[in-house]
Amino acid sequence: MERIVLKADLILHGRELDSMEKGSIVIENGRILDILPQHALADFPITDACELSFPGQTLMPGMIECHNHLCIDATLPEHLELLAWSNECQLTILALKGLEEDLLSGVTTARCLGDKYYIDTTMKKLIEDGKATGPRLLAAGTGMKGSHGAGYIGSPHCGTEEIRNTCRQNLKRGVDLLKLFVTPGVPDPTSSFVPSFLSLEEISMAVSE
């Protein structure tokens, strides 16, 4: 059993990034076991731990990725075009690989802003049940764009009732947030005009849901 204790003058932790002065992080076999004040280490049952001190430094145990799509791996050639022909099985394999890589890179929470086939909500449940490896996920389910909208991830919608239906299907799947693709992902740099592919009524419907 490998245990490492990291000590720093300040540690930010938890969902609200609470601050702890003179804190310590106890890691066991590559996983964070506990976060506690350094003075409490004497009462913590750890032996033969490797201690690393970072005086004058701040540690945040786990980075938060605020925007991702599990079905996209930007390291692959023509990664966006892959979405057009990849099936659910292929995208699931891609998501599992990416989730493990994210966790190993230091990401412990990721916000997924739309994925095909509800892969994000499926992965979230598998991770929570200990059946898959990855960071804690906040899932959006099916992203909604206009029927003439841009992008590869969002599902085309036309009218408030289609928006309402998808919102409710997403909520039934246990999403944490709803994602609207309102404007182009990459606006035209030569124009000051930014089009909206969803109407005010469609956006208002999603907000009301």
Residue ranges and their predicted role:
Residues V5, A49-S53, A139:
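Conserved beta-strand scaffold positions in the cores of enzyme catalytic domains, especially
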Residues D48-M60, D120-K131, T160-V175:
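Short amphipathic alpha-helices and their capping/turn segments at secondary-structure boundaries
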Residues L80-I93, H148-N165:
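Active-site mouth loops of central-metabolism enzymes
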Residues T122, E161-E209:
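Histidine/acidic residue-rich metal-binding segments in metalloenzymes
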Residues Q57-D129, E201, M205, E209:
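Metal-associated gating/positioning segment near the N- to mid-region
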